[in-house]
Amino acid sequence: MRLAEVVRNTSETQIRVKINLDGTGQQKLATGVPFLDHMLDQIARHGLFDLEIEAHGDLHIDDHHTVEDTGITLGQAVAKAIGDKKGIRRYGHSYVPLDEALSRVVIDFSGRPGLEFHVPFTRARIGTFDVDLSIEFFRGFVNHAGVTLHIDNLRGLNAHHQMETVFKAFGRALRMATELDERAAGQIPSTKGSL
């Protein structure tokens, strides 16, 4: 099993992430941001990752640091669990619909961090959650997992549906990219021989 645990402590947040890439979708989430927990649950269930995240942040100010630092720490944990990337599929993609909403996520474990985020949210907030924080979450993940990530909401009227399809598609694309390919066992998935 490919497991990792990462702890990140700053003056703004204290975060612990534990992940099993070869899990069954079990999760234990306590970030202090209920909507973030709901989205992290989508990643775990649709990625079939066993995921534990505990976060304590400066929520008396706002959710920004907690959401961003959770993305950072999750990215670090995924990178640690994958290790040298031998045998992984490297690329992953998924389309996910939810009623009127449809999102596409494509990921490459290239070692080159890059985020293309194109989600025209129809509202600025989902309950109390600022939708802009989703960009900060994924930017933190990308920079610390070392991936190229393209996120596109192709259509949607309900902001909750837009957000949920993004996180579900991300979980499924991440699962595909991190899966071990039996035909490429022990090989780095690159013509360069390294990622």
Swiss-Prot record:
This is Imidazoleglycerol-phosphate dehydratase. The keyword Amino-acid biosynthesis applies. Its main location: cytoplasm. It catalyses: D-erythro-1-(imidazol-4-yl)glycerol 3-phosphate = 3-(imidazol-4-yl)-2-oxopropyl phosphate + H2O. Its EC number is 4.2.1.19. GO terms for cellular component: cytoplasm. Pathway: Amino-acid biosynthesis; L-histidine biosynthesis; L-histidine from 5-phospho-alpha-D-ribose 1-diphosphate: step 6/9. Belongs to the imidazoleglycerol-phosphate dehydratase family. It comes from Paraburkholderia xenovorans (strain LB400). The keyword ATP-binding does not apply. The gene is hisB. Keywords: Amino-acid biosynthesis, Cytoplasm, Histidine biosynthesis, Lyase. It holds the Pfam family IGPD. The lineage of its organism: Bacteria, Pseudomonadati, Pseudomonadota, Betaproteobacteria, Burkholderiales.
